[in-house]
Amino acid sequence: MAVTLDRAVEASEIVDALKPFGVTQVDVAAVIQVSDRAVRGWRTGDIRPERYDRLAQLRDLVLLLSDSLTPRGVGQWLHAKNRLLDGQRPVDLLAKDRYEDVRSAAESFIDGAYV
């Protein structure tokens, strides 16, 4: 049985639960700064704590956005250039370890300050 994102705890569960939001395994690998193969290896539970923390941040960001957007909308927001992020895509900035900047932009979007 598939686990929903809000209930996902294990790394492999989080990766699977992100898919309906348009976040692919390749996206996860880029954000966490690992290979696609490493992400597949998480099925055995073998993930370093700092990598898990980044994965949990991605999960939390998607959950935040999902309160205001459809799953498809979340994926579009993550992959679209964002003027609050100097025209960069949130998913690319997450890969550069700029979670706080992306979260701030997401909160501004949700609060309506984005438009």
Swiss-Prot record:
Alphabetical UniProt keywords: Toxin-antitoxin system
Family: Belongs to the MbcA/ParS/Xre antitoxin family.
Function statement: Probable antitoxin component of a type II toxin-antitoxin (TA) system. Neutralizes the activity of cognate toxin Rv3189 by blocking access to the toxin active site.
Subunit structure: Forms a heterotetramer with cognate toxin Rv3189.
Protein name stated in the entry: Probable mycobacterial cidal antitoxin Rv3188
Species annotation: Mycobacterium tuberculosis (strain ATCC 25618 / H37Rv)
Source species taxonomy: Bacteria, Bacillati, Actinomycetota, Actinomycetes, Mycobacteriales
